[in-house]
Amino acid sequence: MGKYIFNNHALLDTKEGVLKSGFQVLVEGNRIVEVKKGQINSPDAETIDLGGRTLMPGLIDCHAHVFIAQFTDNQSVLPSEMTARSSTYLREMILRGFTTIRDAGGADYGHKMSVERGYFEGPRMFVSGRILSQTGGHGDHRGKADFCSCANASMGVSRIADGVDAVRHAVREEIRHGVDQIKIMAG
């Protein structure tokens, strides 16, 4: 993990809502370790001169869908292409300043681990896996002629769970698959 000191920047103070100068910021790996007015003493850190640019904490997107760009795509686009697309979306999010995202349905543990292991460049992810919905609910994207009783809908992006026992089972399955939270689309 790298160790960096950022200097020569306008530091955004998010509590006061102002830009401040004369500060240095020490980052180790993906963590801000120290923010100090004046010099930070860390001889093993690489110093990066930001040339007067603005430095701010990473943004957090609390409702993203990196795996499903359009729900209608799920009917005609294979999961492998959707995963390839998600790598582009994740990289673009980093470039826009997002360092953490909460994916609210679609992305799973494999997407999260692809970022953590460096296969994809992207922000830290908290994933929901498959969206839970009841038959005919907001997350049931099956076509009117689709009478599948397999509990999956929309290429596995959502899952149908009717009744308490089915919901309990669906939640346990999603947790078993490594999700960080459960997304429910009822109604």
Regions found by a protein language model. Name each.
Residues F23-Q24, A45-E46, P123:
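Extracytoplasmic/periplasmic beta-strand context in beta-sandwich domains
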Residues M1-S42:
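N-terminal metal-binding scaffold of metallo-dependent hydrolase/deaminase domains
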Residues Y119-G187:
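Metal-coordinating catalytic core of metallo-dependent amide/deamination hydrolases
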Residues F6, E46-I48, F126:
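Hydrophobic/aromatic beta-strand patches that form the interior of the parallel beta-sheet core
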Residues G38-M56:
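Active-site metal-binding motif and surrounding structural segment of the metallo-beta-lactamase
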